[in-house]
Curated annotation (Swiss-Prot):
Entry keyword annotation includes Kinase: yes
Pathway stated in the Swiss-Prot or TrEMBL entry: Amino-acid biosynthesis; L-arginine biosynthesis; N(2)-acetyl-L-ornithine from L-glutamate: step 2/4
Any Gene Ontology biological process: L-arginine biosynthetic process
Record-given protein name: Acetylglutamate kinase
Matching NCBIfam families: argB
Species this chain originates from: Leuconostoc mesenteroides subsp. mesenteroides (strain ATCC 8293 / DSM 20343 / BCRC 11652 / CCM 1803 / JCM 6124 / NCDO 523 / NBRC 100496 / NCIMB 8023 / NCTC 12954 / NRRL B-1118 / 37Y)
Family the UniProt entry places it in: Belongs to the acetylglutamate kinase family. ArgB subfamily.
EC number(s) given by UniProt: 2.7.2.8
Gene from which this protein is expressed: argB
UniProt site (Transition state stabilizer): 7, 214
Gene Ontology CC: cytoplasm
Catalysed reactions, semicolon-separated: N-acetyl-L-glutamate + ATP = N-acetyl-L-glutamyl 5-phosphate + ADP
GO molecular function: acetylglutamate kinase activity; ATP binding
Length: 244
């Protein structure tokens, strides 16, 4: 049973192509098991601005207050996820929306509360829930938030949430979908990228900006047993395959 985790951007509900849905349906006919994690950063920022909540980023991480958590839940669970579920339904996929509170799906801890507020990483996944849904031929669509053991909601980077899910589900493949076709060096997409090559390219400042945490997330997944991690803009193209 092949298991595939896909991370898509929060605005992907309006950008996913017919080829995306056709590929997912083809995989399901091959009895592949699929889980999708969605982002939503732009929607969160827009809603924060509307509600006069300061948007502050530290080293690329959104500082999140308790009010910020409430707004994040409104954006992800009230706007982004419903739009994505509807898009999948219209295109013939049987999906179900999940969040951290769905039978304790995602348990996490803060990474540095003094610096980042209620931002965390995931250290436990209720994989039994996912497997039960897979047995019913449902595709879980999961919001990137976690809950601590004491019940505090946390904001989680969507790439990190997808890699954690892939790790605990022992996924065979992970797709980190982005707005470019892969990791580009001098305008050309790298077909393969290893941790050693990544270090060399970083030293030469040839991988910079937002691609660095994405590649690091991919390497984390590869180190934890995911055989193929793709950084790409579509599931129909392998993009850059990251391995250890």
């Amino acid at each position: 049973m092949k298991k595939i985790v896909i991370k898509i951007g929060g605005n992907a509900a309006t950008q996913l192509t017919p080829a995306f849905f056709d590929t997912i349906k083809f995989w399901q006919k091959q009895h592949y098991k699929i889980a999708i994690v969605h982002g939503g950063g732009d929607t969160i920022s827009a809603l924060m601005s509307q509600l006069n909540e300061p948007v502050q980023k530290i080293n690329g991480i959104r500082f999140t207050t308790q009010n910020g958590i409430n707004i994040t839940k409104m954006a992800l669970l009230g706007q982004v996820q419903p739009a994505l579920l509807e898009s999948c339904r219209v295109n013939g996929l049987s999906v179900i929306g999940l969040n951290a509170a769905s039978d304790q799906l995602l348990t996490g801890h803060t990474i540095d509360q003094d610096t980042f507020g209620y931002v965390g990483n995931i250290h436990q996944v209720n994989t039994k829930l996912i497997h039960n849904l897979w047995e019913k031929n449902l595709i879980p669509i999961i919001a990137p938030m976690a809950i601590t053991n004491s019940g505090q909601w946390l904001n989680v980077n969507a790439d990190h949430a997808a890699t954690a899910l892939a790790k605990y589900l022992k996924a065979d493949e992970l797709y980190l979908l982005t707005d470019v076709s892969g990791v580009k060096i001098k305008g050309n997409v790298l077909q393969n990228l290893t941790s050693k090559t990544m270090e060399e390219l970083q030293k030469k400042q040839m991988i910079t900006g937002g691609m660095i945490p994405k590649v690091n997330s991919a390497l984390f997944a590869a180190r934890h047993g995911v055989r193929a991690v793709h950084i790409t803009n579509t599931v129909t193209h392998p993009g850059t395959i990251v391995t250890i």
